[in-house]
C-alpha cells in the first residue's frame, strides 16, 4: 500500500476500462490463467452503499461537483454502471432534515449519498459559505440520521500521511485482523533513529 485515500477516492473506472481492454487484447492469457474478474465491482459497490442504511431498497445517488472535476468521467461511469442518479448539489434539497432529489415526478427522498465532493464544499451552511457545489442543510440531515453520506465527513483525516505508518496497527487493534496488504517501509522523521536513517540515506 502506497497511500490511503478515504475522502473521495477515484480511479476505479480506469481500472475497469483497462481490464476490459486487457481481456480483449490478451484473451488467450485470460482464458488460460485463473485471473479473478472485476466486472461486478459496480454492483458490489451499489450493494455496499445500500447496506449502509437499514431502509429496504434505498435511494442511492452519486453527488458530483460537476463536469469540470478531473474525476467527472468516473462519476458518470459509476452512476451508469450502478444504475443510480448522478446529481449535483442543485439537484438536492433539504426539508425537515431530510434530503430530496428533484425528479420528473416530484421529490424523491435520498437515503444514501456517495459523495465525490470534498468536505469543505458539501454544505455551505456548515462549512464554506461560498460553496456552490454542495447542498444547503445536508449536515443537519446527516446529523439527524436521515441520510447516509459515504464516505462520511471527516474520513479524510485518514488520508493524512502522518497516520500512514500507524494503519497496520489500527487494523489489528480495531478489527482484530492482520492487514491484507503490507505498507511500504515508512520512516517518521520525528523519531531520532528514523531521522538519522533518512539523513544518512538521502
Model-derived features: where do they sit?
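Domain-scale recognition of functional cores that engage charged ligands
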Residues: 1-202
Amino acid at each position: 500500500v502506497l497511500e490511503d485515500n478515504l475522502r473521495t477516492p477515484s480511479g476505479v473506472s480506469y481500472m475497469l476500462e483497462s481490464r476490459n481492454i486487457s481481456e480483449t487484447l490478451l484473451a488467450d492469457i485470460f482464458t488460460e490463467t485463473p485471473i479473478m474478474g472485476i466486472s461486478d465491482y459496480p454492483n458490489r459497490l451499489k450493494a455496499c452503499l445500500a447496506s449502509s442504511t437499514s431502509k429496504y431498497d434505498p435511494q442511492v445517488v452519486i453527488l458530483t461537483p460537476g463536469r469540470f472535476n478531473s474525476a467527472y468521467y468516473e462519476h458518470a461511469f459509476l452512476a451508469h454502471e450502478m444504475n443510480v442518479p448522478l446529481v449535483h448539489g442543485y439537484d438536492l434539497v433539504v426539508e425537515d432534515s431530510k434530503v430530496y432529489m428533484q425528479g420528473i415526478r416530484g421529490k424523491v427522498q435520498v437515503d444514501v449519498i456517495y459523495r465525490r465532493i470534498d468536505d469543505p464544499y458539501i454544505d455551505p451552511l456548515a462549512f464554506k459559505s461560498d460553496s456552490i457545489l454542495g447542498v444547503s442543510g445536508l449536515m443537519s440531515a446527516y446529523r439527524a440520521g436521515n441520510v447516509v453520506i459515504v464516505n462520511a465527513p471527516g474520513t479524510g483525516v485518514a488520508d493524512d500521511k502522518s497516520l500512514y505508518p500507524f494503519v497496520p496497527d489500527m487494523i489489528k487493534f480495531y478489527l482484530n485482523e492482520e492487514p491484507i496488504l503490507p505498507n511500504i517501509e515508512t520512516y517518521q522523521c520525528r523519531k531520532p533513529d528514523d531521522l538519522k536513517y533518512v539523513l544518512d540515506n538521502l
